[in-house]
Amino acid sequence: MNFWRSLLVFVVLQIMLQVAYAQHNVAINEVPLKSEFQDGRDYFSYRSPIKVDRADERILIQSFFDYDCRVCVNTQDILALYGQINSNNVVVEEYPVATKETPFSAQVYYTLQEMNQSDVSDSLLFETSDAVRYKELAKYENLLKWLAEQNVDTERFDLIYRSDEIKKKFSEAVYRTENYGVFTYPFVVIEGKYVLTNSTLYNDDYTFAVLDFLVHKLSNERENKELQ
């Protein structure tokens, strides 16, 4: 019974992905480059672009999130789907927002990543989208109880959470947050040049369209630079 149920879920997911791809089947290079989206309204530009180093030619989309965020769950889903559909052209990475005064999200996120518990991290993002629930789980003892309910080894979690490696990753997260000028969340950076915030990310169709526009714009800029 479980086999057939799993098979059905797999088939449904494949159909959903094919439908989404069909709706999005205009190739990125065929999207017309025109001023249908405006800087300062639909997206924002860095005055000084941040250098992005990648081994391949794909455009980097960086998503900054916080566990105390009602919109971040939807943003994560939107970007995951966009990344799947456009896997040849873009790569999506996610980072926790961190300041010296707010270590919670970064330390918890990197601890769960170290434990290969990405699914639990996703569940926590959904769980803490409610402000009241976030305040509860932001207390370490309550978080450990919740993690135990998710079958996470809390002793190992605590050991990793307090490790030097996680402290180092937290410091890197603080630097990254400051370097990218993250002032809200969700905060999505495209190739170190353009930024999307909740004013765009609240709607999946809107987000897809603006991303297509910016990815096409960046691709054109690269081609023109190579021709010079």
Spans of model-derived segments:
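Positively charged n-region of N-terminal signal peptides that target proteins for export
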Residues: 1-5
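Structural alpha/beta surface segment adjacent to cysteine/selenocysteine redox centers
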Residues: 70-148
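Extracytoplasmic thiol/disulfide redox context detector
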Residues: 6, 19-101, 174, 216-228
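Bacterial N-terminal signal peptides
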Residues: 7-16
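Conserved short-loop catalytic and cofactor-binding motifs
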Residues: 67, 96, 131, 158-161, ...
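A broad, low-specificity signal for short, low-complexity segments enriched in glycine/proline
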Residues: 26, 53-56, 69-71, 108, ...
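C-terminal cap of thioredoxin/glutaredoxin-like
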Residues: 149-228
